[in-house]
Design a protein with these regions (language model features):
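Surface-exposed loop/turn positions
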Residues: 93-95, 103, 114
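Non-catalytic, conserved peripheral segments adjacent to functional cores
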Residues: 1-92, 113, 120-173
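Short beta-strand His + acidic residue motifs that chelate non-heme Fe in jelly-roll/DSBH
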Residues: 97, 105-110
């Protein structure tokens, strides 16, 4: 796969008191000027995305909790068009994922709560919701293997675990 997504490990210090980490240091990524940051707090089983736009770079990290991140290549002429990769980000592993323009991303909260933090770099004005594209989280063409939490209930007719539906926004349904 020719994904342009890059993974970084931020410096951090963890001990019995908690943790301390650096989210960004100038010069880490050349030729990108981050213009603003966003946070999203989610509860367990919340699934957000998949969204993207044509001009924004996103540096994604998890300062609290743990989430499953999916990144999808949406470049139509690419041999990896609609191919996806996944990453588990947490405050303990310190991973950061740089998502380029024309890629969609979405995440699923694995812990009781998780904080999705991202820095945005783009030219011109910010591409707000009306300039973004969305993909269905459960699109069969993508066949994303979301780690939906298994319920302890068993569907005896199907002899399989029942997966609770993820909690979605109106935009993501």
């Amino acid at each position: 796969m020719m994904f342009k997504v890059k993974v970084y490990k931020r410096s951090s210090f963890i001990d019995k008191r908690g943790y301390y980490w650096t989210s960004w240091k100038k010069g880490l990524i050349k030729n990108l000027e981050f213009k603003h940051d966003k946070f999203s707090l989610s509860k367990k089983n919340v699934l957000r995305g998949l969204h993207g736009d044509k001009k924004t770079w996103k540096l994604i990290s998890c300062p609290y909790g743990k989430f499953f991140l999916v990144v999808v290549n949406c470049i139509k002429n690419s041999k990896d068009y609609l191919k996806w990769k996944s990453y588990v980000l947490s405050h303990k592993n310190g991973l950061q994922v740089l998502v380029p323009p024309n890629y969609a991303n979405g995440h699923y909260c694995l812990s009781n709560e998780c904080l999705f933090y991202y820095k945005l770099a783009y030219k011109g004005k910010y591409a707000d919701v009306d300039q973004q594209f969305s993909l269905r989280w459960d699109d069969p063409k993508l066949n994303i293997e979301w780690p939906l939490q298994k319920s302890k209930k068993i569907d005896k007719a199907k002899l399989s675990y029942i997966y609770p539906k993820p909690i979605l926004s109106k935009r993501d349904r």
